[in-house]
């Protein structure tokens, strides 16, 4: 006999509602509802700190086929506020699976809903833009009526807007730590960096573990520092290069990070930024950012390298972008999105610093743009 799952409700701030079944923890959650078009990598997506306070809708219909393991995580816990999917398979099939997705969600306290029309939801978000929502997981046997729906819509309306939210310090580490773990290989698992050629200080605005692994793969001993670390403390560590990580929220309120990045870049330290780090570098260089209608979330985004003409398929996860009209003479565009023409990469014309809006570390997604890590290493070699 198939299990009878408790009812669940997704309500958007505009009053749009979806009834489904609960596949995670009981309770209620609110956040900005976004859609991600990746076919795989749900575990990496859930644990990506960049999804803090966001409810993630996965557009691929079957989610959970390969279960969950203890290695493919980008942080120590789930950071997404909630999960929305179409169908949860009843049988898990993968030799690395440690547990089903539903069990993992329950363990992590993540509220999730399945059995809704995710295509309709995605069309709503595409038309109206990302908006706040509320998922409620009810007790078994609950009849979801007008009162329950009204309460969920009210909760969605009351949730704070992502614009103006500084979430980097919410997800950042509390204290510095060292990172030497390298990428996973079949039959070995994760390795450990043996001989380091460079010392990189990585700002943790919500850093993904695979970024740190790819730096370690290239001979970098990484010291990860909290988001609010002043530049003076970084200089004491005598880094060969500084990395500005990905992260959630609006970059403009992160004045502490912008000030530190400006000081580090002006000092001539080789600097590489990704995602939120890209936006912080742009703000530190005098440019402005803006909130996008529904952002870029997926693993199939084509991006053009303006220097080489090469087109790469990239992983993306951001709701803000750099305004090209605000670039000064000290910044030049290096990459653009072929979906909407938004800026995807920048380089300083007067300092050894560059940044990329997407995710060259993938996890999940393609590795086409991974050469940017090699470019960072080359910058450090030039300055050695």
Swiss-Prot record:
Alphabetical keyword list: Amino-acid biosynthesis, Arginine biosynthesis, ATP-binding, Glutamine amidotransferase, Ligase, Nucleotide-binding, Pyrimidine biosynthesis
Catalyses which reaction(s): hydrogencarbonate + L-glutamine + 2 ATP + H2O = carbamoyl phosphate + L-glutamate + 2 ADP + phosphate + 2 H(+)
SUPFAM superfamilies associated with the record: Carbamoyl phosphate synthetase, small subunit N-terminal domain (SSF52021), Class I glutamine amidotransferase-like (SSF52317)
Record-level Gene Ontology MF annotations: ATP binding; carbamoyl-phosphate synthase (glutamine-hydrolyzing) activity; glutaminase activity
InterPro entries (alphabetical): Anth_synth/Amidotransfase, CarbamoylP_synth_ssu, CarbamoylP_synth_ssu_N, CarbP_synth_ssu_N_sf, Class_I_gatase-like, CPSase_GATase1, GATASE
This enzyme's EC code(s): 6.3.5.5
Location of the active site: 275 (nucleophile), 359, 361
Residue ranges crossing the lipid bilayer per the database entry: none
CDD domains: GATase1_CPSase (cd01744)
NAD recorded as keyword: no
Record domain Glutamine amidotransferase type-1: where: 199-384
GO process terms (BP): 'de novo' pyrimidine nucleobase biosynthetic process; 'de novo' UMP biosynthetic process; glutamine metabolic process; L-arginine biosynthetic process
Top EC class, one word: ligase
Pathway: Amino-acid biosynthesis; L-arginine biosynthesis; carbamoyl phosphate from bicarbonate: step 1/1; Pyrimidine metabolism; UMP biosynthesis via de novo pathway; (S)-dihydroorotate from bicarbonate: step 1/3
The keyword Mitochondrion belongs to this UniProt entry's keyword annotation: no
Region spans: CPSase: 1-195
Binding site for L-glutamine: 50, 247, 249, 276, 279, 317, 319-320
Similarity annotation: Belongs to the CarA family.
Subunit structure: Composed of two chains; the small (or glutamine) chain promotes the hydrolysis of glutamine to ammonia, which is used by the large (or ammonia) chain to synthesize carbamoyl phosphate. Tetramer of heterodimers (alpha,beta)4.
NCBIfam families registered for this protein in UniProt: CPSaseIIsmall, PRK12838.1
Purpose of the protein: Small subunit of the glutamine-dependent carbamoyl phosphate synthetase (CPSase). CPSase catalyzes the formation of carbamoyl phosphate from the ammonia moiety of glutamine, carbonate, and phosphate donated by ATP, constituting the first step of 2 biosynthetic pathways, one leading to arginine and/or urea and the other to pyrimidine nucleotides. The small subunit (glutamine amidotransferase) binds and cleaves glutamine to supply the large subunit with the substrate ammonia.
Name of the protein in its database record: Carbamoyl phosphate synthase small chain
Source species of the chain: Rubrivivax gelatinosus (strain NBRC 100245 / IL144)
